[in-house]
Amino acid sequence: MNAFFKITLVVLSIGHVGCVSAQALAKGLAPQVRVHGLMWDAHEVSVGQVRQFAQQTGFVSQAEKDRGGFIYEAGWTQKMGWTWRAPFGKLAQDNEPAVHLTFDEAQQMCRFQGKRLPKDHEWVKAAYLEQRDQPPTGFQKGQRYTYPNGQSAHKSHCLNGCGNYQGTAPQGALWRGIGHVPVMTTSPGVNGLFDMGGNVWEWVDTGQGSEKMTRGGSWWYDADRQIESDVATKPKDTRVGYIGFRCVQDN
């Protein structure tokens, strides 16, 4: 077990997960919640966590090697300098979700911590089926919800049909949308997890050949992309500004 993993395991009750500061994330500190026998990252992996990983391993992402990741602007457009460090061309804060990372890069970071990317069936069960014995008001054990935030997407972050949040993209940087919000900005949803719906898509370890699935929708899409039946697949070397990830740990 490496030093990075030792400082990332901070277990909180899934009934109450408080705010995590950028300073804590810069040190690799991030909360986990237990859902159906797995320890889940309560939020998407942050820029601060990736920064820790890069400092300890010398990691350089494919987007960095290529001098920039991609965004869709009436066609895929490469953006020079847009990487996990600067997702919209401006240096990110440590508490922003890490994007512009491929499936293999995400899996590599999870495994470095003694974790892994979730399988699709694991992700779906955690996102839509409430499993807490005593969930807070608004959730009921055993109920399957339409959205990861409950019966509506109003407390998540997306293009239309979600909450009123301010994205981190500089004005004029994007052809569409306002970018992601820092992790744990929105309200916790089913099972106490943050941003399983909206903010950024999340890689899951399911797919055939060079294709892998993403789940949950993102800031670039409307709320209807957050529902359980919406299944998206992408080439696993995709590195764009609205796909991130979270890790799980087997008990």
Regions flagged by a language model, labelled:
Residues 2, 6, 11, 15, ...:
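Extended beta-strand/loop cores of jelly-roll/beta-sandwich
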Residues 60, 71, 78-99, 103-232, ...:
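Functional-site microenvironments in short loops/helix caps that host divalent-cation chemistry
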